[in-house]
């Protein structure tokens, strides 16, 4: 088994020694890059773009050509699973995802397809294989999925929302139906992540974007319990290598201890949680990822550098920190500000004695 030339990201996720804090950026492949916008002109339909392995591979690689990032994340979308289940999904340019046949009854849930993941989503696995070959072991590749709760939000609401009131009301009105939907999504998500690992993903991540909308009791019942099931059933070793698992719940800081106990290796933090306090709360149970406010990337390099250093200082000495944003990068972010962020993290991250890589030993 060939070693990664840069396994800093994986070592940090496993809380092994690192020479500096690794950095990558959520949505690092995307609309803030002019080369991505040019690539999208070839296939304006977003889902068609995602389903073209060569284009998804190219989009994945683009940010690594500009910035010395410590990980790549496969270009895709969290709604690939609902799409494969037969919902009528459209990505509207100014609206976002629209599902024309929302799932709001037991009959709707029963009509959903449970496809063979490796066939229905083969385009994603082909994209991963192409990307792994193109990366040539330079950095790890992250695979990902949306959390069952977050996917269910879109499927029941029918479109994006700030509150997902329809989805939340359904929890109270038809809890059994919602649990059935979540279990179907969980079963497919486990198969989906395992197939990504089989195709070559080195790390997998679950985005629970809308978990923070729930009450503490409902969060555990309708989101975290399903995340824990995924953690228990996703492959965590491959060819003698550990496959780290990251959970990210936006606005989930109040449940940090519960998330840390759910079976993941690392917890992503949004910008509303102090990372130093978070580290004290979780101890050595998990690594932490985050958590710069994406809005600061719309300011200036000096402010960005100061904010990045503040986060690094707040986390403190030792491994177990992956620097990232607290959410996805805004499409209007200037490229020079991204470069300033990556440079600041690399220059100012607290350095430890450079270790001998233990990941592939």
Curated annotation (Swiss-Prot):
SUPFAM superfamilies for the chain: UROD/MetE-like (SSF51726)
GO biological process: heme biosynthetic process; protoporphyrinogen IX biosynthetic process from glutamate
Pfam families for the chain: URO-D
UniProt keyword Phosphoprotein, yes or no: no
Protein's job: Catalyzes the decarboxylation of four acetate groups of uroporphyrinogen-III to yield coproporphyrinogen-III.
Entries under NCBIfam families matching the protein: hemE
Protein name per its UniProtKB record: Uroporphyrinogen decarboxylase
Biological source species: Coxiella burnetii (strain RSA 493 / Nine Mile phase I)
Originating gene: hemE
